[in-house]
């Protein structure tokens, strides 16, 4: 298995292949010679900082990035049980197609693992019509012999084989009820992300999978890094953007093998393989509310603007996340909700936040002195509720009930 290095793939494609932009970026439909193999092609693919190349050379380049990400760290043992998370987006179909291709190679190049695919149905949470069952069946037939399953977000016991799947009633979804009880869209989106991660972990354990593949690409991870810091999850931000995330329970490991791919490469791959996404990107929960509706929406819009106008800056953000180290302490307790390390030390920042919250809750009937309020803030931080700071913030927004 190959490994990836700075010389092979720089911040914007291949650093060693930087050229003056003579051709427009994108898919050039006029015939020409491939810069790699010199074969005449009717369809050339022009990536940033790369010469125009034919379909076969582009696919080899993109698939090499996928294999190199796994090979660099050698984190996927032979014959591992892998759960691939499919959400119907273009990038998840690209991951599925790449993994299927890697499974169909000869013995020397074959990626030796046993693959299960789970489609996470979350359209009902967004109050949208679910993806057609026939479309899902078509995908499962195309990528046989992978085993396909379906599970609905908010329905932990709804895991079914795709051939046996029947949608459950929306009225029975407890997740929708919990989301309605949260006051801000920021808290809802954060809670939904953590809930989804825990649901996928439970599916992996049910299917006896030791590794989970998610389809996050570079721009997603740049957004996630900034969002995590803004939400008070900075201590675990490194794991949010790393190739390997080992916070899931039951020794399940989360892998992001597409982390080095860009949006442009995903678009080209979809075109080259004639794949049909089940829905378009940008349909995440709450995105239709506008850019300023939540911290997540605002950060996503900010990164999208950077990607459009200063593409190398986005790559710098993403690569910075790669360089952040996690303070690993085996004896440190973990948050019962997000599995991140607990904020065990009493910091001035957290104390100031809880102090402000205590003052706000006291309101106009404030009759406590400064020391009483500071003592109350310290008690809150020392309370053994098993939640990190970010998850306590979500808990504080519940009108009633418990986060878990």
From Swiss-Prot:
- Entry protein name: Cytoplasmic tRNA 2-thiolation protein 2
**Which species does the entry assign this protein to?**
Drosophila yakuba
Q: Give any GO molecular function from the UniProt entry.
A: nucleotidyltransferase activity
Compartmental location = Cytoplasm
- Could you name the Gene Ontology cellular component terms for this entry? cytosol
- Annotated family: Belongs to the CTU2/NCS2 family.
Which Pfam family, just one, is annotated for this protein? CTU2
Give the source's domain of life in one word. Answer: Eukaryota
Q: Which GO terms describe its biological process?
A: protein urmylation; tRNA thio-modification; tRNA wobble position uridine thiolation; tRNA wobble uridine modification
Q: HAMAP family this protein is in?
A: CTU2
Pathway given in the UniProt record: tRNA modification; 5-methoxycarbonylmethyl-2-thiouridine-tRNA biosynthesis
Alphabetized, the UniProt keywords read: Cytoplasm, tRNA processing
Q: What does this protein do?
A: Plays a central role in 2-thiolation of mcm(5)S(2)U at tRNA wobble positions of tRNA(Lys), tRNA(Glu) and tRNA(Gln). May act by forming a heterodimer with NCS6/CTU1 that ligates sulfur from thiocarboxylated URM1 onto the uridine of tRNAs at wobble position.
